A protein has these predicted regions:
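Helix-loop-beta segment of a Rossmann-like dinucleotide-binding subdomain
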Residues: 1-9, 191-198
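Flavin-dependent oxidoreductases
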Residues: 2-139, 154, 160-162
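C-terminal catalytic lobe of FAD-dependent flavoproteins
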Residues: 119, 123-131, 137-248
């Protein structure tokens, strides 16, 4: 049912990113997951956890990261345990594991990227996803983020040293909705609802649409089998990453 009336269909496909929680609740699916541990015991955890994804842009020249032969560079992702010092004050920012990613901004504003996100310390039903992104009055990147990210850029590539003042201040970032193990769920519910809860893996999901379409038409995918919802109760979990990013 919608504000425009009832829409009938044979199959519903839900791929709603950070709004996965809302559709999950509409379907009255469980708010907790039963997870079978290595010890054989069942553990109960919240079905969803929201993370705040912090991102920004440093206003360097558009070709600042071009390769020696003039081509566009790849997305750079770095996880490190090296001490990180401020590019401005040289003070220690962290001596714990940290991570960043960066690439040329698609609008030509410089270099865009982010740091490892942080957990929103609220029950998932209390998190306001809307208004989303730059429109959110509650979830925005901080000054601490800009100092950390710009300093990490300088740590990774000397060409960024002394460039922290070029950071473009403004609203940025957004929420991510993570599953209990931070890996996606691809599964069918109530016979004709297919859920793609991608846990913000983004670019890694490029090939999923075709696999999901084939499953809906009756050809089960061996690649998607490990991502069924019942993996939690069966204890068929994915490896735990040591990365500070929940989707790595």
């Amino acid at each position: 049912e919608t504000d425009k009336g009832t829409i009938e269909c044979e199959q519903v496909v839900i791929g709603a990113g950070p709004w996965a929680r809302d559709f999950w609740n509409m379907l009255e699916l469980p708010k907790t997951a039963n997870i079978k541990g290595k010890d054989g015991k069942m553990h109960v955890t919240d079905m969803w956890t929201y993370w705040m994804l912090q991102e920004g842009v440093i206003g360097v020249e558009p070709d600042f990261l071009k390769t020696n032969d003039g081509k566009q560079p790849p997305v750079v992702h770095v996880d490190s345990t090296a001490p990180l010092y401020s590019d401005k004050t040289k003070k220690l920012l962290t001596d714990k594991i940290w991570g960043i990613y960066y690439k040329p901004d698609i609008e030509g504003l410089g270099v865009q990227g982010g740091t490892s996100p942080y957990i929103v310390k609220k029950h998932f039903d209390q998190v306001n996803v809307d208004p989303y992104g730059i429109e959110s009055p509650e979830y925005q990147t901080t000054d601490a983020f800009s100092e950390m990210w710009c300093s990490a850029l300088a740590h990774c590539q000397k060409r960024f040293e002394g460039k922290s003042d070029l950071y473009r201040k403004g609203p940025s970032g957004g929420l991510g909705c993570m599953t209990p193990d931070s890996f996606p769920i691809f599964d069918r519910f109530f016979e004709n609802v297919y859920m793609i809860a991608d846990a913000n893996h983004g670019y890694k999901m490029i090939g999923v649409g075709e696999l999901v379409a084939k499953e809906i038409l009756g050809t089960e995918s061996d690649l998607l089998k490990p991502f069924r919802f019942n993996r939690y109760e069966k204890g068929e979990l994915h490896p735990t990453s040591n990365s500070p990013f929940p989707w790595s």
